[in-house]
Amino acid sequence: MMSAEPFSVSRCTARLGRIAILWRGDETERRGATLQASRFKDVFAALANLGVDAEPVVYEDDVLDAVRSQLARLDGVLVWVNPLHDGRNRAKLDALLREVAERGIWVSAHPDVVLKMGTKEVLHRTRTMSWGCDTALYRTVDAMRAELPARLAAGARVIKRNRGNGGQGVWKVEVLATTDGRPSVRVLDATKAEPEETPLEEFLKRCAAYFEDGCVIDQPFQKRLSEGVVRCYMAGDRCAGFGHQKVKALIEAPAARATAGARLYTSKADPRFQRLRRLMEDEWTPQLMSSLDLARRDLPMIWDADFMLGGRGVDGTDNYVLGEINVSSVFPIPDEVAEEIAQRVVDRLKSKPDLAAAQTVVER
């Protein structure tokens, strides 16, 4: 049973507040963590420039109590931890973050917001939005066994586990002609280069463990995937930058794989993506908030949405199809995004009643 004593909140002097930037790492990294050596050094610097004191907090499950003590002294925490990492999940961390949030420490992104926004289920919940497509959700392997064959008959599908990162649990699936009375499929793991052929039932067995995360998502394969994926970075409800990448994941053609490369980052002013920016800021993010019952203040300080190209409209403009939303550990980021994050942190800290009152006293 965790202590029920209230957490302390830092007292503002000439500064706006004190926060942590938290990421996962081993004991060596924890002992040697500094602002200057951190991969988040630009975020630390941007926060300092706006009057926010930030410190590194390196997390692992076996130092949970020490991390709790660190967070107890602070006003908030920005969290960069993937859902899955070397076989470990976020279960213990999420419990800690819920605890500190209940005791007045601001958490971004809150685990409950991650569950709403940062899992593949959001693709099904928002499928009727104009970024959506023919998206199915399976709660059990039996439901998947019953419904997937009919969808495969219409074309290749992409199967996605509800929680994961780095392409883990993502498969392109195509139906094969039945030769021995058993349906077979051709599957391509997003983390691998070569497809394999297997009985459908064997593939379903592989997917059985995914249902521990609550569901499996099924979307049509987007034929224009080889043209690239556009990542729209969001700071709260405002666009903060873009990344464009020719990907290898789920791509089989050697020529297309040969053109794949690193993600190229640009500012929010990139003229190629201004239509996408307007859609995200003016239409899709408000609709997302309404669909998920989220307030503006609930939105993560940094999150992103990955878009593939769908069909073209009658006027020739590209339609964007949402592939996933990333909330848990959005990094690396375009250079300009650090300042956007810092400004959203300032806005959030100023909205806290205790800090707002302290700031008023200082300004007097």
Regions found by a protein language model. Give the residues of each.
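C-terminal active-site "lid" helix and adjoining low-complexity regulatory extension at the edge
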Residues: 293-304, 308-364
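Active-site nucleotide/adenylate-binding loops and adjacent lid/helix of ATP-dependent enzymes
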Residues: 12-23, 98-104, 110-217, 226-227
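A short, flexible N-terminal coil/short beta segment enriched in small residues
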Residues: 2-35
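Conserved N-proximal alpha/beta basic substrate-recognition cap immediately N-terminal to
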Residues: 25-147
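Phosphate-binding site of ATP-dependent enzymes
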Residues: 167-293, 308-311, 321
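Short beta-strand-initiation
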Residues: 154, 227-229, 300-304
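Short, solvent-exposed loop/turn segments at secondary-structure junctions
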Residues: 26-27, 83-84, 114, 164-165, ...
